[in-house]
Amino acid sequence: MVVEAYVKQTEALEKKNRIVELMLEREHASSVKSVLETLNGLPGVRMWSPFHKTSIDHLIADEASRQGFIAFPRAEHKRTGEEDLIWDPNAVDDFCRGDMHKWLEEMPNYCYYNCAGEGIGFARQRMALFIYALQRAYLPFEMKKVVVQTREDIESSMKLKASNAIFYMNFKAYGGPQCRGIVRKQVIED
């Protein structure tokens, strides 16, 4: 049972990493590469061991939602063995467990922050990467509004760097409909 889960986990990770390789080979490689460097450069983030888990719930109009799982390795981190590939589900904070949150649920004991300026640029880079990975296409879009939800009561400027955060994003695809996206960020530090 454990071996089967390990094999499935490894195959899924290899498939996602191949998508990243394909993205870097395409014409928009420079912009995608800069997004990957930005994500890999975040302090305290090791995206290979343990996994950097992010789920995205991409809602367009009233259509059904799509969820994705994306894990990226740090370029300088070398795999040393099985311990680097096993995801410890008990290490995931309750804030990021279960089904994807609904759109901007008002919940007690949670903090909300409306991003502006640099925050929107940071969220835009993340959204561009996830849309590219899920759709395998570069979709130009305009970021309208970003709200960050955290459990920790931290300074507003630090919410983008929180270990556990949910990003609610309104954006408009050029020539397309108004869209909403939810990105759930979970970083487990050693």
Curated annotation (Swiss-Prot):
InterPro entries tied to this protein: MS5 (IPR006462)
Pfam families found in the cross-reference section: protein_MS5
Family (UniProt): Belongs to the UPF0725 (EMB2204) family.
Name of the protein: UPF0725 protein At2g20625
The species this protein was found in: Arabidopsis thaliana
Lineage, highest ranks first: Eukaryota, Viridiplantae, Streptophyta, Embryophyta, Tracheophyta
